[in-house]
């Protein structure tokens, strides 16, 4: 028996059979086009050696395609009804492949390594629009074992993730995701391949983690770099000198730190690359603690203080 992918009629029939209605609060839009899920899986390059983390499997369209590639899949689903139904759907549309599936009923934003017994090597998902960026950044930080990411997100989010410094779409997500790896666009996806049909187009984005990170990857270092990014984009039209003035303690000190990092103080924050942010922090190592963007002005004393089919709902 070979794997049968889900079509539009099957998706709607399946939802009706379990009396399920998509919830906007969970960003539930299900892919019903076999060519689209094959395209996503092919672009991800996953194979039988991979352990794939899938976020928001929904009714199982992408899950089936991933299993068809021979990969082991851990599917994390926040909706208990869908999490309970998924193994049944996979078993009905495949054969022994269901034994390579684990389903966890969890919130992806609080999902952690201790929730899994084996670390994933890839992340492939149709991310819910409402949590796409936070979920992506959280998983990249929490699971350094993830080497490849292929996600489908709202087209606007895809543009932001892949944007280059200085462009109109370049912002916090663009810079932060590049802390972990290289980012590439993989085209658009029409709303017509979803049920219910969303009002916007979707985009595919692939992230390949750096084989050897150019900078430290510990949590403390990452958080400090991210704070600098937040500070810069909270005031993106200001010069870097002015944007970082409160963090540095004064405009002159800000300029000194920027120059030490080979950054022109007159450059705007929206032109700084991830390399610039990292270098700024490293050149400011003597000042180690980076205050949060929203309380930087109140921290003048900081310098002186120098994760067979199973469903788990646990």
Curated annotation (Swiss-Prot):
Binding annotation for S-adenosyl-L-methionine: 29, 31, 56, 77, 107, 126
Q: Which InterPro entries match?
A: KsgA/Erm (IPR001737), rRNA_Ade_diMease-like_C (IPR023165), rRNA_Ade_Mease_Trfase_CS (IPR020596), rRNA_Ade_methylase_Trfase_N (IPR020598), rRNA_adenine_dimethylase (IPR011530), SAM-dependent_MTases_sf (IPR029063)
> What would be one Pfam family of this protein?
RrnaAD
The entry lists its GO molecular-function terms as: 16S rRNA (adenine(1518)-N(6)/adenine(1519)-N(6))-dimethyltransferase activity; RNA binding
Q: Provide the protein's localization.
A: Cytoplasm
Per the UniProt entry, the Enzyme Commission number(s) are 2.1.1.182
**Region annotation Disordered: residue ranges?**
291-314
Provide a GO CC annotation, any one.
cytosol
Q: Which reaction does it catalyse?
A: adenosine(1518)/adenosine(1519) in 16S rRNA + 4 S-adenosyl-L-methionine = N(6)-dimethyladenosine(1518)/N(6)-dimethyladenosine(1519) in 16S rRNA + 4 S-adenosyl-L-homocysteine + 4 H(+)
**Where are the annotated coiled coils located?**
none
Entry keyword set: Cytoplasm, Methyltransferase, RNA-binding, rRNA processing, S-adenosyl-L-methionine, Transferase
Q: Which chain regions cross the lipid bilayer?
A: none
Q: PROSITE patterns given for it?
A: RRNA_A_DIMETH (PS01131), SAM_RNA_A_N6_MT (PS51689)
Biased-composition ranges, Low complexity, are 303-314
Q: Where is this protein primarily located?
A: cytoplasm
The family database entries (NCBIfam families) matched by this protein are listed as: ksgA
Q: What's this chain's function? A: Specifically dimethylates two adjacent adenosines (A1518 and A1519) in the loop of a conserved hairpin near the 3'-end of 16S rRNA in the 30S particle. May play a critical role in biogenesis of 30S subunits.
Instruction: Write out the similarity annotation.
Output: Belongs to the class I-like SAM-binding methyltransferase superfamily. rRNA adenine N(6)-methyltransferase family. RsmA subfamily.
What is the official name of this protein in its record? Ribosomal RNA small subunit methyltransferase A
Q: Which organism is it from?
A: Mycolicibacterium gilvum (strain PYR-GCK) (Mycobacterium gilvum (strain PYR-GCK))
> Which gene produces this protein?
rsmA
């Amino acid at each position: 028996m070979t794997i049968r992918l889900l079509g539009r009629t099957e998706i709607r029939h399946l939802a009706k059979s379990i009396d399920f209605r998509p919830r906007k609060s969970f960003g539930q839009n299900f892919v019903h086009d076999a060519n689209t899920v094959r395209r996503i899986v092919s672009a991800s390059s996953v194979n039988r050696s991979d352990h794939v983390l899938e976020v928001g499997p929904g009714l199982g369209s992408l899950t089936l395609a991933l299993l068809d590639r021979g990969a082991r899949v851990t599917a994390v689903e926040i909706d208990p009804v869908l999490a309970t139904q998924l193994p049944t759907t996979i078993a009905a549309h495949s054969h022994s492949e269901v034994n390579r599936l684990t389903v966890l009923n969890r919130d992806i934003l609080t999902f952690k390594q201790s929730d899994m017994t084996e670390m994933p090597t890839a992340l492939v998902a149709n991310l819910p629009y409402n949590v796409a960026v936070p979920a992506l950044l959280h998983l990249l930080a929490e699971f350094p074992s993830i080497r490849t990411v292929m996600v489908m997100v709202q087209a606007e989010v895809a543009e932001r993730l892949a944007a280059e410094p200085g462009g109109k779409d370049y912002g916090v997500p663009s810079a932060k995701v590049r802390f972990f790896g290289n980012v590439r666009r993989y085209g658009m996806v029409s709303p017509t391949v979803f049920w219910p049909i969303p009002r916007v187009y979707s985009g595919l984005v692939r992230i390949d983690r750096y084989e050897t990170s150019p900078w430290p990857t510990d949590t403390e270092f990452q958080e400090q770099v991210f704070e600098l990014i937040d500070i810069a984009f909270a005031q993106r039209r200001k010069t870097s000198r002015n944007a970082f003035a409160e963090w540095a303690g004064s405009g002159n000190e800000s300029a000194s730190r920027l120059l030490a990092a080979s950054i022109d103080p007159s450059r705007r924050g929206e032109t700084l690359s991830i390399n610039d942010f990292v270098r700024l922090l490293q050149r400011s190592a003597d000042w180690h603690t980076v205050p949060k963007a929203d309380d930087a002005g109140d921290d003048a004393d900081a310098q002186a203080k120098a994760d067979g089919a199973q469903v788990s709902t646990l």
